[in-house]
Amino acid sequence: MRTIENSLLVFNQGEDEQPGRHEGVSVAPEKPALKRPARYRVVLLNDDYTPMDFVVDVLMKFFAMNEEKATQVMLLVHTQGKAVCGVYTRDIAETKAAQVNQYSSECEHPLLCEIERAD
């Protein structure tokens, strides 16, 4: 004998007409379509005082980059004035930017990080 698992249909043997029930079969309500959350870029800004090694350290520590990738992003910050460190949902982007700004301040560097909407 076979068993039915995860069935969405329920058979009704009663004769009562109830909303949502047709011919002895109950129809599961449709799940609402979920909207993807907005995405935000975390952007590191260049300054003339923060050492390049510190920027690489920040990228490795807060954005889980390896040394090679962190160096590439640091050079983009240095040559273009800013670079994207990652794209996240708003809460995560705000948290990462705040962590970088706090860490930089504690280490007495003027390095700044901000977020901007990506989509």
From Swiss-Prot:
User: Which InterPro entries does this chain map to?
Assistant: ClpS, ClpS_core, Ribosomal_bL12_C/ClpS-like
Superkingdom is Bacteria
Biological process according to GO = protein catabolic process; proteolysis
Q: What family name appears in the similarity comment?
A: Belongs to the ClpS family.
Q: Whom does it interact with, and what assembly results?
A: Binds to the N-terminal domain of the chaperone ClpA.
State the function annotated in the UniProt record.
Involved in the modulation of the specificity of the ClpAP-mediated ATP-dependent protein degradation.
Q: Which PANTHER family match?
A: ATP-DEPENDENT CLP PROTEASE ADAPTER PROTEIN CLPS, ATP-DEPENDENT CLP PROTEASE ADAPTER PROTEIN CLPS1, CHLOROPLASTIC
Protein name, per record: ATP-dependent Clp protease adapter protein ClpS
Q: Which organism is it from?
A: Marinobacter nauticus (strain ATCC 700491 / DSM 11845 / VT8)
